[in-house]
């Protein structure tokens, strides 16, 4: 079945193109011959999308979990932008012609073609796997692409150009990052601010704030991503992993950060909302009725809504690690070993294993901790100790495997999860601290939070590691009302409820699990929700402005006592620049 779509976002209706009066392909060819910047780049990107030809029943790819996604260059030609951007959508495994036997029928093979003639000769006589095959053909008209490669697959994306604009557009088309006249985009797209009702000149002011953030010593490295109207329009990073320390390297766009308390809303809270949707819990349930372990304790009558909004009277936290070190901050031998055994099972960092019974100690001290009954707001990590246990109780899986199978893998957040060293090299993870008060080492790839570290890095309040791209996908899922990539995760009304100011009338500005703008905030829209993290992270989602703002840094390196980030208001200043860049009036 033939499918040819002329892609365009609705926003382009407000951005007249010369191509409207003539041939879009000729206009695109003409534009590529000139130096392009700012608003012109947005127009050319739109032309690239408009002139892309798409054929085949398997485009866009929806299910990212059925099997692996492989990528092969059909010949020697490299397609750097295409290869970069398909990796933004999913984990991609490179494969050569000699390795095609690795692919099974559940997998997907994407073949990149820069030169149709060379590629045709290169593929001749090769036995291709019996799986979904998608070809991205550049430098060839649609008719030639179909004639040359139609015997290989029905699924062909083609462009007459090899320019990076076309390569990005092809990646978007394959994974559903573009809309057409028949269907909306199902995943984030990539482009320029003017394609999303924003000003490139205004948004570029963030660059100077990024430099100032690093050069002031607020954090060694920082990454900011802004998405609006379903399109990533700003995605830049600055700085290094460890400042001037030996072994430091420049940060890049794929770096993985310790998300700290952003874990609460990007790992644990989705399952609390799901339990609510499924009728397994109600907001006015008492904790002891939902979790029998709290029966007979001073927490049994706490309402779930009060726990979610941090007004249940829970203690803020307990510095458990202080109970396991001596007066010189050295680990006490009864609590630690340098190698694991059946007793010392909790790895807190390389060469340091805590006694396994500490897990029960942490739980017992949390259960027995004092409470207050005045309904005052006290931000508490214990709330999400509880909700992690609740999710695991109902779903019968550890939280770290639950988020992978039910959230991150299907959504395409392939670089997210707990304990990243199990999947990625240490060099791809920014360090969180040169820690000198407990573990006495550079903490890199192990959770910074001390309580989560005792729990093998997995907790409801901390432990998630992620990238700006992956946090944008999760945020867009929330902004879409609970759907992403053609799959529904939550209902819109559930997200509306949990992100609302539930106890506004009683002076509490928090959402149900989500953070929200304080009553004095003059930057964010009133319906904005998200969370910040101790390590220097922030995720904010504004439904009214249709905007996602991601800020990632390792401000705790080399010391968690570094407060320059908050004193300099860098996160807020960048967010204010995002709102100032909006040109289509939808700021509130």
Each predicted region: which residue ranges?
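Short, surface-exposed beta-strand/loop micro-motifs that present aromatic residues
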Residues: 535-548
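Bacterial Sec-dependent N-terminal signal peptides
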Residues: 1-25
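Coil residues (strongly favoring Ser/Thr
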Residues: 41, 96-97, 202, 208, ...
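Short, surface-exposed loop or secondary-structure junction motifs
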Residues: 299-527
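Short, gly/Ser/Thr-rich active-site loops of penicillin-recognizing serine hydrolases
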Residues: 23-26, 59-61, 146-147, 180-186, ...
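Preference for extracellular/luminal or secreted protein segments
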Residues: 21-195
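Short active-site loop at a secondary-structure junction
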Residues: 216-225, 245-309, 369-383, 459-462
């Amino acid at each position: 079945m033939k499918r040819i779509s002329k892609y365009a976002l609705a926003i382009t209706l407000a951005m007249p193109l010369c191509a409207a009066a003539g041939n879009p392909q000729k206009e695109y060819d003409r534009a590529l011959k000139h130096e392009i910047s700012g608003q012109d780049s947005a127009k050319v990107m739109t032309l690239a999308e408009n002139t892309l030809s798409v054929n085949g029943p398997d485009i866009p790819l929806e299910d990212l979990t059925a099997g692996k996604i492989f990528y092969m260059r059909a010949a020697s030609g490299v397609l750097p932008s295409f290869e970069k951007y398909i990796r933004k959508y999913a984990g991609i495994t490179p494969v050569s012609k000699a390795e095609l036997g690795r692919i099974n029928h559940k997998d997907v093979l994407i073949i990149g073609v820069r030169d149709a003639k060379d590629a045709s000769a290169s593929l001749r006589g090769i036995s291709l796997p019996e799986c979904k095959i998608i070809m991205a053909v550049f430098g060839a008209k649609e008719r030639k692409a179909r004639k040359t490669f139609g015997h290989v697959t029905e699924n062909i994306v083609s462009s007459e150009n090899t320019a990076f604009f076309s390569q990005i557009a092809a990646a978007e088309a394959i994974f559903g990052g573009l809309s057409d006249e028949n269907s909306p985009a199902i995943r984030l797209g990539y482009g320029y601010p003017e394609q999303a009702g924003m000003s490139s000149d205004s948004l570029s002011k963030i660059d100077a704030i990024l430099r100032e953030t690093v050069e002031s010593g607020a954090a060694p490295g920082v990454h900011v991503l802004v998405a609006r109207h379903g399109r990533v329009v700003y995605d830049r990073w600055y700085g290094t992993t460890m400042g001037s320390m030996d072994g430091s390297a420049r940060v890049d766009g794929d770096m993985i950060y310790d998300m700290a308390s952003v874990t609460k809303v990007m790992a644990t809270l989705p399952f609390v909302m799901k339990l609510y949707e499924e009728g397994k819990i109600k907001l006015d349930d008492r904790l002891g009725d939902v979790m029998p372990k709290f029966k007979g304790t001073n927490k049994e009558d706490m309402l779930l809504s009060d726990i979610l909004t941090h007004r249940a009277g829970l203690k803020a936290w307990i510095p458990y690690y202080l109970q396991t070190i001596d007066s010189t901050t050295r680990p006490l031998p009864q609590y630690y070993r340098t190698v694991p055994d059946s007793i010392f099972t909790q790895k807190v960092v390389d060469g340091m294993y805590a006694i396994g019974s500490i897990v029960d100690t942490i739980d017992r001290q949390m259960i027995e901790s004092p409470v207050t009954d005045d309904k005052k707001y006290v931000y508490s990590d214990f709330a999400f100790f509880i909700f992690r246990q609740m999710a695991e109780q109902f779903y019968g899986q550890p939280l770290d495997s639950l988020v992978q199978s039910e959230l991150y893998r299907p959504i395409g957040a392939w670089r997210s999860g707990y304990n990243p060293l199990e999947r990625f090299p240490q060099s791809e993870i920014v360090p969180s601290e040169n820690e000198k008060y407990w573990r006495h080492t550079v903490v890199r790839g192990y959770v910074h939070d001390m309580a989560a570290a005792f729990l093998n890095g997995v907790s409801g309040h901390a432990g998630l590691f992620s990238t700006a791209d992956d946090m944008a996908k999760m945020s867009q899922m929330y902004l879409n009302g609970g759907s992403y990539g053609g799959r529904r995760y939550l209902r819109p009304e559930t997200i509306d409820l949990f992100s609302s100011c539930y106890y506004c009338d009683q002076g509490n500005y928090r959402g149900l699990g989500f953070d929200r703008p304080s009553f004095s905030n003059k930057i964010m829209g009133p319906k904005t929700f998200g969370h910040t993290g101790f390590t220097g992270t922030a995720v904010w989602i504004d439904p009214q402005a249709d905007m996602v703002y991601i800020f990632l840094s390792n401000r705790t390196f080399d010391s968690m006592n570094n407060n320059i980030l908050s004193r300099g208001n860098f996160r807020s200043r960048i967010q204010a620049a995002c709102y100032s860049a909006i040109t289509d009036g939808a700021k509130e």
